[in-house]
Amino acid sequence: MLAAMSLSGIDRPTAAQLRAKRMALLAVAAPTLFTFLGVVLYMLHDPVPDTWLWVACWAIALALLLQSDNDAPARVAVRLVPVPLRVAHGVSALALVMIFLALHIANHLMFPAGEGSYDAVTKVFRRVYRNDILQPLVVALFLFQVGTGLFFVWRLTAAPSDRFRTFQIASGVYLAAYMLGHMDSVFIFARTYLRIDTGWDFATGDPAGMIKDPWNIRLLPHYWLAMFLVLSHLASGARVIMITHGVGKALADRLLVAGAVAAGHL
């Protein structure tokens, strides 16, 4: 994250600096990408250890970075994100919050209450977002978020940005990877491959649990960062809206920091 912020401040980056910035943003998503990779390899019966493939992928990425020209300026055209698409991204995010995310996060906050309370709340909430109309809509909204979000990332990283905008971009990269991986874990891995319910046992990694199992331990940063960054990303979007509507940048920046701090304490 810090490397991406530093590189994003360069006005006229070289080809190597631009590639390094984008690679640093991708590295922010490393915890969720590693989980995604592990799930996919598990369904393929682990043809190679996930750690080996993981190291190989980053070694290739590093080799590509080292081959980049650090003298020639990056040949990219700085183009703005279309306003209608940006508005659609925000509106669809708000729809997801109202239809699904608020209930889903509230459900997960029931973990300290124990399995019985968690499952009882899950059953109630699933009547809302798992019906034949809303569930396909939720999936479509998530895919729209991922597609438009990655398009924004590519456009926005072609231009310099301050640390607050870079944080918004980085959190978006993480969430795009997380959403794709989470939908794969739920719809393909759990419901199709294992044919199990995605309730308490699935969420907590039972019977081994998350802490003591060498595979499940990766789920802790995977889930915690998702919770932190989804709330922080919403705060980042609110910051942009406030600045657009005349709120002072300093105040909007402070409100984003406050939102991120609050998200980190959940």
Give short role names for the model-derived ranges:
Residues 1-266:
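Membrane-embedded alpha-helical bundles that constitute the cytochrome b-like, heme-associated redox core
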